[in-house]
Amino acid sequence: MSAAQILCLGEPLVEFNQTPEGQFAMGFGGDVSNVAISASRHGANAGLITRVGTDPFGAALCGLWTDEGVSTAHVTEAQGEETGVYFVTHDTDGHHFTYRRTGSAASRLAPDDLPLDALQSCPMFYASGISLAVSDSMRAAVVAAAEATRTAGGVFAFDPNLRVALWPLEVAREVTHSVMAACDIALPGLDDARQLTGLQPPEEIVRFYHDLGPRIVALTLGADGVLISVDGDMRTLPGHRVDAKDATGAGDCFNGAFLASLLDTQDPFAAAEHANMAAAISTTGYGAVAPIPTLSHTRSALNAAWQS
């Protein structure tokens, strides 16, 4: 496999989703894993930096990444440790998540685990707010990896991806703003950004993030599309009309498709157009991974949209 163009650091998870019959179907989760898979399906050489346990769940994740063309060269199989899992149950009040991730193999990732040579030769490094919230050691690893990539001339892309169940909002604000100040590409979602910044209008949020440091800000707006800005040149790309069933992982799909397209075209606006369509398509199926479209699927849908 060719050297990775995008290295993604975070915690992968195995999902057990309750079926209508009361059984649990196994699937895969973890935002950074989803981004790597989306980037790979959209033509980039993507790789993961993480740790999994020497258990059937870690083996299943490694098998998934191999099947998806995502490099596992920097995935450590930690002897005697466990892979994080979560359960999704359903009732009249909606979906409920139960996590079993405390002390997981991934949560023990630390700066000493980083493949510095690979990071220094990689054009792009990606992490999320969840990567920062999982543990203090993973947070330190994200900061060190971003510094290694940027010092060598690469770029750092970051999605603040807020999970208040993982850490208090005030702590999340302080840490994510600090990391955002050291990134080149900001990929926030509107709901998360409103909580983190205290601002409401999308344009004000974009200006806030530009002022922190990122040159490129792609603020995803859910079904309303994306507000993409390069050095303050803002353009809103409306959402695409689709038969949406499940928006799980749509933001991750956007991020992977955007970064892959940006590496290919070097045009943030074209990349946002491409990723906007990919994310829309991903909502037409169920789950985070299965509905992520391929490069050819996304291009065909874009061509059809332009011709209509």
Task: Label each region the model flagged.
Residues 5-7, 123-124, 185, 216:
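Structural motif
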Residues 1-5, 147-148, 198-308:
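Conserved phosphate-binding/catalytic region of the ribokinase-like
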Residues 10, 158-160, 188, 219, ...:
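Active-site flanking residues adjacent to catalytic metal/cofactor-binding acidic residues
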Residues 117-118, 178-179, 210:
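Structural alpha-helical scaffold elements that stabilize or flank donor/cofactor-binding regions
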Residues 45-129, 154, 299-308:
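Conserved N-terminal subdomain of the carbohydrate kinase-like
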Residues 1-71, 243-245, 308:
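Glycine-rich phosphate/adenosyl-contacting loop at the front of the ribokinase-like
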Residues 124, 130-207, 224-226:
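Conserved beta-alpha-beta core of the PfkB/ribokinase-like small-molecule kinase fold
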